[in-house]
């Protein structure tokens, strides 16, 4: 039914596209190009070559995801979730900016190096845990966000030189020749030949490594060969058409939903489903272009359409369970001297305001007017944002009983950002002003919608699958942002800067309101600690103990939405504070929930102030956004922290 449905939808969308674009007899569509006039030849290449590229690229991405899932025995594995694509894209961006002479050898080699390095990093981080499913996906998430933050820094500093690269990397499938089709066809043929002798070893390895070894399977060699195949195929697809997310994961998830067990049939089916998914996406994007008045990259459409697909697939796999992990950093209950931490945060803010760099070098600033007007608002804005993100992370991890939950990972911050973006674009059309109040309501609506979806899914699926919700929402936001960037609307320049996580726009007149909101939300979080602690034991236990589960849960969701939206409005959605700081607070002895909330708030404020200060001066006179710096710091911290997970996971 799924396959037939995709065939019908692809055929209908393709026919609608032909009716609009092709005015000659249908029989001439596949005639030799040289027999057509110039306009018809261009249209033929645009329609047929683009469709062929979509079919081949989508099919190859589906095969890649099946190989990865078979290799690590994880239904969440794909080129998207394991950071393969972003590694290839970052490598090509670096070469474009700094080593353009290497481009004469073609993009395949550059993308291959990036793909193999990012995938190797993910595997190296998760290997000590024996590829624990959640550790593997978390490592992929961390690498994705970290590499995206690095790419964001490069784009900010080399905006003009990277503009063409970003437009291409958004995933444009439109073709004007058969070159990409031939390259992808050769790749598909070679990949099929390479996979044939691997079918039996992969089947044996899907049972148990020890049994496979006893049967004579060279496990390490097979794994290395599969990794090389995955990296080569992904690199070639990205070098030809840019980054296409979700197609591989969607195709592999559909194969899993169909219950196909034979590895050969899984690969063939994944190729067909991936091909149809990307063809359908490409057709929809082409059909929408005249309506929206702009080119729509297929890569952006896969993110926008992929999120609903993934949510549906999660519900289809609700009976599947993947193992969970214990908190990433355990701690003993210790006495936490909060006044010392509070003084430490105050000193950090003072140093960030007074210890500065200018044209004369480093020194202590004595210009109070300058500090009060510019530096203090930025430091206070960063502190308030870090505080809110950290508190939201503690609340989410307790509420969902998931140590990996945070506004960033579960897509709450992305939902708030999407709400703000849509409000900014749509409110003027509706005759409403896109002011701070209306944008706050838009952001709250987006964050609340994501939270309600997460809580609804949390009762139906394993907590590990909730990670896919965050990946889906983040991909949807990325897709919208790609379209925003390509729209050329000058009003959106400030929004693009805001989305990178900058405190540049902090004002003395508004920062105290932001700090007040952060403190009020922290107090509200402390007031709801008791029912939250009981909810953390499970809804059944909470009801037996007299907790009104639904009202309390909705209150908590509203609180998390307010925390996420206020912080997102302040510095954008990009950071790692909500995921990193709760674990850090626990490791420092704040085991009890109320202590964890207080210490996490102080740590979040301090870390964000430091990130903002580093961003201001590390490349002086240029600046790095605080959110981007926090993402890099947090990503590096988690890369180190994940190495400690096996001890917790196996204990």
Question: What function would you assign to each model-found segment?
Answer:
Residues 1-651:
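Alpha-helical transmembrane segments in inner-membrane proteins
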């Amino acid at each position: 039914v799924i396959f037939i449905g995709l065939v019908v939808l692809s055929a209908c969308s393709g026919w609608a596209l032909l009716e609009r674009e092709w005015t000659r007899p249908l029989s001439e569509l596949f005639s030799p190009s040289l027999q057509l006039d110039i306009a018809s030849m261009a249209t033929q290449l645009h329609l047929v070559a683009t469709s062929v590229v979509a079919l081949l690229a989508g099919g190859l991405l589906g095969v890649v995801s099946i190989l990865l899932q078979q290799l690590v025995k994880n239904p969440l594995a794909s080129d998207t979730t394991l950071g393969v694509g972003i590694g290839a894209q970052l490598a090509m961006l670096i070469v474009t900016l700094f080593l353009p002479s290497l481009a004469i050898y073609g993009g395949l080699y550059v993308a291959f190096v990036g793909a193999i390095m990012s995938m190797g990093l993910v595997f190296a981080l998760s290997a000590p845990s024996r590829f624990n499913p959640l550790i593997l996906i978390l490592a992929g998430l961390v690498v994705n966000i970290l590499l995206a933050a690095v790419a964001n820094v490069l784009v900010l500093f080399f905006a003009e030189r990277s503009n063409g690269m970003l437009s291409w990397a958004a995933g444009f499938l439109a073709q004007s020749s058969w070159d990409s089709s031939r390259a992808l066809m050769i790749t598909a043929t070679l990949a099929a030949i390479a996979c044939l002798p691997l079918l039996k070893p992969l089947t044996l390895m899907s049972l148990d490594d020890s049994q496979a070894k006893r049967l004579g399977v060279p496990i390490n060699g097979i794994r290395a060969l599969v990794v090389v195949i995955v990296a080569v195929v992904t690199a070639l697809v990205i070098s030809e058409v840019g980054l296409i997310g979700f197609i591989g994961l969607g195709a592999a998830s559909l194969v899993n939903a169909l219950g196909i067990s034979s590895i050969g049939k899984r690969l063939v089916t994944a190729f067909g489903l991936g091909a149809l998914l990307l063809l359908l996406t490409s057709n929809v994007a082409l059909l929408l272009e005249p309506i929206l008045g702009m080119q729509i990259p297929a890569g952006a459409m896969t993110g926008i359409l992929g999120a609903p697909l993934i949510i549906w697939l999660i519900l289809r796999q609700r009976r599947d369970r993947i193992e969970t992990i214990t908190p990433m950093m355990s701690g003993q209950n210790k006495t936490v001297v909060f006044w010392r931490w509070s003084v430490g945060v105050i000193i950090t803010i003072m140093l960030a305001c007074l210890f500065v760099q200018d044209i004369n070098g480093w020194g202590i600033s004595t210009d109070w007017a300058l500090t009060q007007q510019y530096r203090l608002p930025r430091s206070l804005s960063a502190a308030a944002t870090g505080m809110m993100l950290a508190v939201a992370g503690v609340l989410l991890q307790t509420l969902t009983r998931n140590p990996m939950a945070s506004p960033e990972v579960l897509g709450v911050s992305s939902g708030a950002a999407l709400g703000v973006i849509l409000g900014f674009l749509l409110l003027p059309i509706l005759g409403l002003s896109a002011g701070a109040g209306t944008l706050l309501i838009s952001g709250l609506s987006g964050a609340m919608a994501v939270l309600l979806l997460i809580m609804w899914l949390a009762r139906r699926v394993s907590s590990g699958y909730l990670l896919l919700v965050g990946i889906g929402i983040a991909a949807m936001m990325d897709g919208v942002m790609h379209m925003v960037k390509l729209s050329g609307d000058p009003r959106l320049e400030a929004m693009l800067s805001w989305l990178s996580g900058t405190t540049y726009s902090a004002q003395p007149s508004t920062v105290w309101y932001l700090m007040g909101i952060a403190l009020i939300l922290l107090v509200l979080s402390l007031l709801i600690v008791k029912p939250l602690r009981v909810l953390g034991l499970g809804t059944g236990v909470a009801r037996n103990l007299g907790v009104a589960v639904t009202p309390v849960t909705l209150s908590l969701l509203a609180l998390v939405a307010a925390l996420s939206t206020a912080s997102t409005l302040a510095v954008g959605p990009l950071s790692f504070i909500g995921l990193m700081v709760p674990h850090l607070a626990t490791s420092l002895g704040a085991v009890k929930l109320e202590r964890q909330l207080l210490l996490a708030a102080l740590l979040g404020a301090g870390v964000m102030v430091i990130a903002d200060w580093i961003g201001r001066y590390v490349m002086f006179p240029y600046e790095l956004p605080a959110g981007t710096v926090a993402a890099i710091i947090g990503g590096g911290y988690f890369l180190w922290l994940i190495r400690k997970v096996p001890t917790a996971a196996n204990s």
